Amino acid sequence: MSKFFSLSLVAVVVAGGLTLYWRWPAAVPEAQPATTVAVPSRQSLIEQASTSPAKAPAEAQPSIAVTLPSLAGTEVDGQLRTDAAGNLLLDLAVRDYFDYFLSAVDHSGLDAVIEALLADAGRRLPEPALGQMISLLGDYLDYKRASMALMQQPLDARQQVEPQAQLQALQSAFARLDELRRAHFSATAQEALFGAEQAYARYTLDSLAVQQRDDLGEAQRTQLLEQLRERLPDALRESEQRQQLAQEQLQRSEQLWRDGADEQQVREFLAMTYDPDTVQRLLDEQRRERDWQQHYQAYRNELASLQGRGLSEADGEQLQRQLRERLFSSEDRHRVETYDAIAAKQPEPLDP
């Protein structure tokens, strides 16, 4: 069991790492065929802006909720600011502002999103900042268009189950994204929009590489990881340290469950660090995870008994698909497939 879950943990870490990069657009549901989003070019964006009233009265402009219903009831994320000379200030808040509107693409379409974004920005920014924002948005959309092909490339069979291959795939994706960003943005804009993300992504990949080295003792590995952590910007380092402490607390609480502790004992342990609402949320999450693992193990047991009937490979694969569809929701099946792929590479069966 431990070997299986150690590998599955790597898969989860890798999947989590990918979310550092993939922020556009929302995933296409399984039941729908994948389609290509037509991202407008910088020139067409400028033309669209020039045909829209830049400073129409507020009452003449439809609200964001009307134009983009999926954003109803939400606050505009990010911020558009100017310096004393009226120039656009570049920081992560500008990217957050873009992404807030772009999150509605799947629901409302890109044309409506761009129209709403330009109308909102026109009420917030004077010139020359407005023109600078439009130019930057054009670069951002061009970058998104160029990066979509990279995002859509699936992992091959080896990359799905081998940690070293997964790490190499992530390193390659990171390098290619970095090249795309350098090609589409000035050095100043790249640092402002992606600097923190790139620093943490580089730290994550370097940490995974250290963890996979078998020529290091535990003390050497700990020292190298600490050196990597020290290179992070202060804010990221403090955040990472908080995450590490939280992860250690959760691991200790999970060990309590494995050692036979009851819920009250785990609650008391977590209460030494977290407030009551957070303790309850963590207990609920751990309970759901234990239930899911038990459900998955029951599925594996039923699958093993069915596969013991001497079915052909094709019949066995069809039976496995049918069993997944019967026992798991569509949201859970990707996780089941990942676990199954890992289990298929293990020489020993999973412990019940």
UniProtKB/Swiss-Prot annotation:
Q: Where in the cell is it found?
A: Cell inner membrane
Q: Which key words are in the record? A: Cell inner membrane, Cell membrane, Chaperone, Lipid degradation, Lipid metabolism, Membrane, Transmembrane, Transmembrane helix
Q: Which residues form the signal peptide?
A: none
Q: What Pfam families does the record point to? A: Lipase_chap
The way it spans or sits in the membrane comes to: Single-pass membrane protein
Give GO MF terms, alphabetically: unfolded protein binding
Query: Which residues are listed as membrane-spanning?
Result: 7-28
- Biological process according to GO: lipid catabolic process; protein folding
> Which InterPro entries does this chain map to?
Lipase_chaperone
The organism's superkingdom is given as Bacteria
User: Under the cellular component aspect of Gene Ontology, which terms does the record hold?
Assistant: plasma membrane
Is Membrane a UniProt keyword of this protein? yes
What does the UniProt function comment say about this protein?
May be involved in the folding of the extracellular lipase during its passage through the periplasm.
Q: Which HAMAP family match?
A: Lipase_chap
* Stated family: Belongs to the lipase chaperone family.
Protein name per Swiss-Prot or TrEMBL: Lipase chaperone
Name its species. Answer: Pseudomonas wisconsinensis
Query: Which classification does the entry list for the species?
Result: Bacteria, Pseudomonadati, Pseudomonadota, Gammaproteobacteria, Pseudomonadales
Primary gene name? lifO
